[in-house]
């Protein structure tokens, strides 16, 4: 019964698309109309395990909480750095910049995150193939640009990293004294896995929360005169990836380009879903930061645990999320040390994601503030770390 109703709805929508090409529900841009999508996509479900699937198959897998790389156009990722050993990257034994970081932590404002997230979730969807996704990306780019301008960050820059599907990724760069680079990431797109091109996807938690969390961390990081003047030992980048929900497409494109360019990325942290704590509290568990332990760099992950202990007001919990579960996996595949933190033990994470109900009202900005503290503490410590 449900399938027949959905088919009727889908058919009616297609008719409406033909009859009313300017209807706001029709999410493909005119400029994208000539893009020819393949009938099937090549996905990687685990190392070496690939499968050809349709787009509907992709969404069906995601509804079953099965993650993957879409490698249809990214088969070269990891082929150049496959012999690169991330074990050679050594992280500090403990945080060493407490005196500089603690005053900065006091500058983080959850009100800023709320204000940004209210606008970011007001787009009907941020689906990467939609004009809404392109518009939300343009809005976010402007917020990042304004953040740099307001800080007087004349040495810093921000650019759109274009993709053929229309929604650009965003990269903000704060040059340091070397090309060794520390990356902080989140994904900007959202999706409704039932009918991505039609249904609303506010994406407050997934990953609007991570998007505004790292934006606020960037704002406060730029209050450091040393960072602002380019005196950090290492270059800092903040990334907002497009099309994570489609199979880590945006981050794959970026890290494939970095791999080809020989970029020296020393660390990458992904902040994906930073705001939901209710299931944790309902289970009688303490509010905590979920530190992912599978398919991540152990040294970087160990250092992140120390950062949480020193700079956050809540503990961490160790948890797992599986293969290709967020954009850090693209960095890892390219041969770069990567890590991932999430709002809780994975079993208590937000089950409203990928639906119309992924709304601000279910989130805790106090919890997001803890993720911002983690982000700020980590990026500052690693910006001044003495990597070989």
Curated annotation (Swiss-Prot):
GO molecular function, one term: metalloexopeptidase activity
Listed Gene3D superfamilies: Zn peptidases
Propeptide stretches in the record: 20-88
Cofactor(s) of this protein: Zn(2+)
Signal peptide start and end residues: 1-19
SUPFAM superfamilies in alphabetical order: Zn-dependent exopeptidases
Superkingdom of the organism of origin: Eukaryota
GO cellular component: extracellular region
EC number: 3.4.11.-
Residues annotated for Zn(2+) 1 binding in this entry: 187, 206, 272
Annotated glycan sites: 98
Matching Pfam families: Peptidase_M28
Primary location group: secreted
Keyword terms, alphabetized: Aminopeptidase, Disulfide bond, Glycoprotein, Hydrolase, Metal-binding, Protease, Secreted, Signal, Zinc, Zymogen
Keyword field contains DNA-binding: no
Binding annotation for Zn(2+) 2: 206, 245, 354
Cofactor, how bound (note): Binds 2 Zn(2+) ions per subunit.
Keyword Kinase tagged: no
Entries under InterPro entries matching the protein: M28_fam, Peptidase_M28
Intrachain disulfide bonds: 321-325
GO biological process, one term: proteolysis
Compartments where found: Secreted
The protein's assembly and partners: Monomer.
Family designation: Belongs to the peptidase M28 family. M28E subfamily.
Function: Extracellular aminopeptidase that allows assimilation of proteinaceous substrates.
Protein name: Leucine aminopeptidase 1
Gene encoding the protein: LAP1
